[in-house]
Structures are given as structure tokens and as C-alpha cells.
């Protein structure tokens, strides 16, 4: 049976990519609202009442408004409300929403599949959580470890205004931002990894449209048990064994990594680069997650979750 899907905010960067990915997916029918009715609550509510699943590609406040609209719809009609995937950050730590990272832990994929409401992870958070959670679960990384997360994304991560600035040539080639140290992805990183100490998250944007690297530097000699690079690699490998989208790769001998290699895919690659046998006695590692910020970091993840929820 064909499932009807409405993308609320389909004209935005993430919405457009989700629409493109769904157009060739068997078993779904995309339902759109006329452009002049996008801000008409009655028209939107009526359309939501006709579909099986709504994907929210909106700013946080607008996403909350749409969820309230769906709640009102269900209360007034007496019919089951449509299922929701929210790509905003509004519900990523909400207790009544399922976090849409199926690889998070055993049972998470089943939780997403049966969920009424799924909150899509943030792009940076996807990489950070993918690196940190397995190490905490394996007992290699205490939850109160002081961590830093220097990361870089393509300019599409900044939305329409940043895209226009870079594509017009008016933006810098590389820029560190978020230096108020209050980035909206930090709460979900802490919540879904079990960290008890706030990590120092340092995002940057480069002059390329899509792609992302999330880095996790570690002083291995300062961690309890002094884990080796092999210990870290094995913990990640065990956690993601059998995953279709998350893979643990060997560190390349060149010691470099291209941020653009996974563009237009839903893949997430994890690597451990290390110097854990240095003559000075200090043991260092940097773990790196590579993904497409608009793929596994946004639209690809939304479609992955949709397919689980609808059994496609």
C-alpha cells in the first residue's frame, strides 16, 4: 500500500534533498502544498490529515508549531495523527521522541521502526555520537572526560544565507564559528552519549558545499587503563558490526582525510589515527567521523528513518 508523505519545508536545503531522494522510492507518494498556502494553517492542517507521515524541515519554533497543529488535528478528528520525522533540533532530547540514529545502540533501530515521532540527529552530533558512545559503553572513556570536538562542514550546513554568501564569493575560504561555545548540538551529544562533562565543540566551515569531518582528539596515556589505538578501533568495530551505513575503516598511511569523499551518500566512516608508541611516552589518538552533512547528517538519515518507520 502506498504511503503518503508531506515534507513541511520542502523548499529548504534539507527538504529539497529529501524530496529528491524520495521521488524514486517505491511505495511512497509525495504530497505538496501550493506555494501560496504554505503559511496558511488551515490548508496545512487539512493536508496533514490526509498523509501517513510528515517530515518537518523547519526552524525549531516552526517545527514546534507544526507538531502542535498535528496534536490539535488528532484531538479534533479522533483519527490517528500522522507519524512525524523532525529534522530540526526542537525535539532531540525530548523524552517522548525517539532519537533517529538507528545505530546508537542495540534496539534503537527497532525503536525507530515502531516510533510515532522521530527526531533526526544533527549533522555534527551524528559524527560525535558515533565516535563517543561506543567508547563510553566499552568502558574506555569515562563519561566525565574533558573532550574537544574540532569539526568542519561544507557551507550548505549554514542554510540559505551561508550558501548564497559562499556561492557569491563574499565569504571567507575557512571560518571558525560558534565561539560563544553554546552550540545547539552539544545537549544532544551529551544526552545520547552519556557524557556528564560538556565537551568543547569547535565548529568551522570551509569553502566546499557538502562534506563533514568531526574530530575527537584523545590523550590515551591520561585515560584509565591507557587504551591503545587497537582497543579504540575494536570497540568501534564491535559496536557497528553489521551496520549497512556506519563502517569502521583503517587509518590510511598518508595521514590525511578528504572531507568530500562521501558527498551524496548516507554513509558514515569512522577512523582511528594514533601515535601510541611514541618514544617520549605520550600516547595520542584522533578519531575522525566522515560524512555528508546533508546525507547521513540530514536528508539521508531522514529517508533511512522513514524507510524503517514505514517498513520499506
Model-derived features: positions:
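N-terminal Rossmann-like NAD(P) cofactor-binding subdomain of oxidoreductases
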Residues: 1-172, 177-179, 271-279
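Short amphipathic alpha-helical segments
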Residues: 127, 228-231, 298
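C-terminal substrate-binding/catalytic lobe of Rossmann-fold NAD(P)-dependent oxidoreductases
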Residues: 13-45, 57, 145-146, 150-151, ...
Amino acid at each position: 500500500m502506498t504511503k503518503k508523505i508531506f515534507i513541511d519545508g520542502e523548499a529548504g536545503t534539507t527538504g529539497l534533498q529529501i524530496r529528491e531522494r524520495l521521488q524514486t522510492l517505491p511505495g511512497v507518494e509525495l504530497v505538496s502544498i501550493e506555494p501560496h498556502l504554505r503559511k496558511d494553517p488551515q490548508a496545512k492542517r487539512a493536508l496533514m490529515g490526509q498523509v501517513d507521515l510528515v517530515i518537518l524541515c523547519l526552524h525549531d519554533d516552526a517545527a514546534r508549531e507544526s507538531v502542535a497543529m498535528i496534536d490539535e488535528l488528532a484531538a479534533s478528528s479522533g483519527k490517528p495523527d500522522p507519524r512525524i520525522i523532525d529534522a530540526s533540533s526542537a525535539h532531540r532530547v525530548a523524552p517522548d521522541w525517539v532519537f533517529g540514529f538507528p545505530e546508537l545502540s542495540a534496539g534503537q533501530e527497532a525503536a525507530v521502526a515502531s516510533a510515532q515521532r522521530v527526531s533526526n540527529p544533527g549533522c555534527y552530533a551524528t559524527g560525535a555520537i558515533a565516535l563517543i558512545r561506543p567508547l563510553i559503553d566499552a568502558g574506555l572513556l569515562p563519561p566525565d572526560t574533558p573532550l574537544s570536538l574540532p569539526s568542519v562542514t561544507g557551507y550548505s550546513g549554514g542554510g540559505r544565507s551561508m550558501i548564497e554568501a559562499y556561492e557569491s564569493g563574499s565569504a571567507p575560504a575557512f571560518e571558525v564559528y560558534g565561539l560563544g561555545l553554546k552550540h545547539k548540538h552539544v545537549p544532544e551529544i551529551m544526552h545520547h552519549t552519556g557524557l556528564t562533562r560538556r565537551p568543547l565543540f569547535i565548529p568551522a566551515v570551509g569553502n566546499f558545499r557538502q562534506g563533514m569531518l568531526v574530530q575527537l582528539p584523545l590523550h590515551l596515556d591520561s585515560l584509565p587503563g591507557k587504551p591503545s589505538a587497537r582497543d579504540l578501533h575494536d570497540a568501534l568495530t564491535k559496536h557497528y558490526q553489521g551496520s549497512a551505513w556506519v563502517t569502521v575503516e583503517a587509518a590510511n598511511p598518508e595521514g590525511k582525510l578528504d572531507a568530500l569523499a562521501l558527498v551524496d551518500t548516507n554513509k558514515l566512516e569512522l577512523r582511528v589515527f594514533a601515535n601510541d608508541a611514541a618514544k617520549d611516552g605520550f600516547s595520542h589518538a584522533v578519531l575522525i567521523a566522515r560524512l555528508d552533512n546533508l546525507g547521513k547528517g540530514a536528508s539521508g538519515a531522514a529517508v533511512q528513518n522513514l524507510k524503517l518507520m514505514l517498513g520499506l
